[in-house]
């Protein structure tokens, strides 16, 4: 395996997050993946979309189901009062950070003006952010696409994001209409690096050490990445990324992993 051609900063300070994937990265998956492999700096839950959490959503964020992991619950809504109500409940469970989903490209979600669909109404989005950043008891991070249909939507969105003290902005540099097809627009991430002062995280098409090398070559300032589908395709991907960047990696034995899988 080729070693990542990265800077010393990347070798020692790269952070890795597990992406939220609806119906897939539930607490059962997160817990057992963490026991078999581990090493993620943050684990993001699939989105919560009900003001009054249903049993599945509540089980996913219960502290006893997230032991040993820095878990960040994600909320999908376009109503400030719903976001704040859920944030209050999550604060009661001891969480310190909540993530706003502005990235889901699903047609059913977008049709309700949520997820990436909320990006299509920037004035309403800014009003929403005004209220939640003023009143939320938790730190807020955001996961975003770069627009709905056109690349020129990104610059106005960056101007909105500049106004708010977000914990972190996680950018999947594709438009909503692109789904997961085509090549991520790395130049859009570079524009965010120039425009924003908050911490940034890159998300999109990290499936191998080589793919991460290509991204870092073009975006050398990246020190945090979020991985989703790549982990589902190759559960050991994170360890391959760390090994390629010369980080020391301690893995459970095959027998220990098998024992966990039998429990699952």
Where are the regions that the model predicts?
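Alpha/beta catalytic cores of nucleotide-metabolism and tRNA/nucleoside-modifying enzymes
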Residues: 3-7, 12, 16-17, 27-28, ...
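N-terminal small/glycine-rich loop or linker at the start of catalytic domains
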Residues: 12-15, 51-70, 104, 111-112, ...
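Hydrophobic faces of well-ordered beta-strands that scaffold small-molecule active sites
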Residues: 16-19, 43-45, 71-75, 98-100, ...
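Active-site beta-loop-alpha junctions enriched in small/polar residues
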Residues: 21-23, 48-50, 76-78, 103-105, ...
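Glycine-rich, positively charged N-terminal anion/phosphate-binding segment
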Residues: 21-93
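Alpha/beta enzyme core
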Residues: 35-37, 84-98, 102-108, 112, ...
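Conserved phosphate-coordination/catalytic loops
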Residues: 77, 119, 123, 183, ...
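Short glycine-enriched, charge-decorated loop/helix-capping segments at active-site entrances
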Residues: 113-119, 178, 245
């Amino acid at each position: 395996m080729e070693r990542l051609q990265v800077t010393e900063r990347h070798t020692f300070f790269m952070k890795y997050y597990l992406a939220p994937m609806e119906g897939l990265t539930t607490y059962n998956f997160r817990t057992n993946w963490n026991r078999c492999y581990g090493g993620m700096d943050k684990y993001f839950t699939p989105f919560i979309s009900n003001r009054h959490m249903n049993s599945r959503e509540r089980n996913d964020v219960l502290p006893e189901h997230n032991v040993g992991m820095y878990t960040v619950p994600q909320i999908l809504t376009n109503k400030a009062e719903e976001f704040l109500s859920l944030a209050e409940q999550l604060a009661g469970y001891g969480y310190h950070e909540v993530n706003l989903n502005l990235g889901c490209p699903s047609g059913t979600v977008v049709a309700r003006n949520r997820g990436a669909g909320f990006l299509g109404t920037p004035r309403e989005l800014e009003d929403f952010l005004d209220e939640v950043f003023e009143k939320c008891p938790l730190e807020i991070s955001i996961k975003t696409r770069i627009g709905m249909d056109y690349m020129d939507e990104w610059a106005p969105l960056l101007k909105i994001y500049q106004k708010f003290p977000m914990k972190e902005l996680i950018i999947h540099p594709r438009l909503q209409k692109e789904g997961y097809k085509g090549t991520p627009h790395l130049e859009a991430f570079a524009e965010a690096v120039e425009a924003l002062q908050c911490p940034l995280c890159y998300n999109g098409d990290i499936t191998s050490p080589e793919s991460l090398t290509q991204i870092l070559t073009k975006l050398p300032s990246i020190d945090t990445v979020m991985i989703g589908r790549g982990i589902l395709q190759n559960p050991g991907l994170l360890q391959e990324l760390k090994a390629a960047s010369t980080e020391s990696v301690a893995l459970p034995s095959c027998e220990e992993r098998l024992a966990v899988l039998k429990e699952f």
